[in-house]
Each structure stands twice: as structure tokens, then as C-alpha cells.
Amino acid sequence: MSTYKNKVYLASPFFSDGQRERIEQVISLLKQNDTIDSDQIFNPQEHQFESEPFGSFKWQDAVFASDMRQVHKADVVVAILDYQLEDGLTEPDSGTVFEIGSAHEANIPVIMVQFGEKSQLNLMLARSYTAFFNGREDIQNLKNYNFNNLEQKYTEKKVL
């Protein structure tokens, strides 16, 4: 019997080298997971509509429409919460939070990933995830997590 392979939308900021490195680590782990279709991991940074001038209205419209369409086509959203971790800031990126909310509203499971272990978690995020992988060691478990069963995995983070 073959195992279903899930399509993933990867929600994450990708504006700095540190952010892009975290994305690559998470993608690498997901590609090792037997319940993930490694060819169906949608990474928004790879779909930026270069045919339109960056920041223009047409570019904004195309990127927003594409990202929202892909969130709703995904079986699961994996969200990297770290935004400005290198600067010691622990608030998630607003775009990532929007994508989490969109997925949750559409009943698409959200798997949260956070490299910064000591941060606190906003109540709205704390109630919207299916599983939470906290810290570099725990994040390694993404490669073995069963995205078909989607077992609830809680975090001990303080909730605000």
C-alpha cells in the first residue's frame, strides 16, 4: 500500500541570509519525510513574478493571488515563525502570520517551526497549530513526523 504524499505550502520570511538558511534546513528535512511530496513543497520565494517590477501594483497583486491560491491548494502549511532572530527579535513576520490565519480559516493544518527556543507565543498562534517544533534539535523531527496522521504536538512556550 502506498503512502499518501502531502503538498506543503512553506510560510516564512525570506528577506535575509539567516531566513533563507532556515528555509533550506526545513525544506531538506521535509524532503526526507515519506509523507511529503518533495516535488510539491511550495516555497514562495521561488515564485516572485520577476516579469513585473518589484513592489508594483501588478507584482503585489500577482504574488498575493498566487500565494493565497497555493495556501488553499496545500494539504498542510508549514510555517517558520522566526523573523529577525539574528537581531534578537522574536515576533513572527506579518506575512507568515497572515498565511497561518488563512490556512487555519480554511481548515488546513498548520505545522509551526521555531528555531528561537526562548520566545513567547501569541494566543492566536497558540490556538491555530496542529504541531509545533521548537528549537534546532526538535526541528529535526520534521523528517519523521507523520503528515497523514497529523498528531497534535504541543509546545511549552509561554502564551501571551
Task: Describe the residue ranges of each PLM region.
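Conserved catalytic or regulatory cores that recognize and/or transform ribose-phosphate-containing ligands
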Residues: 1-160
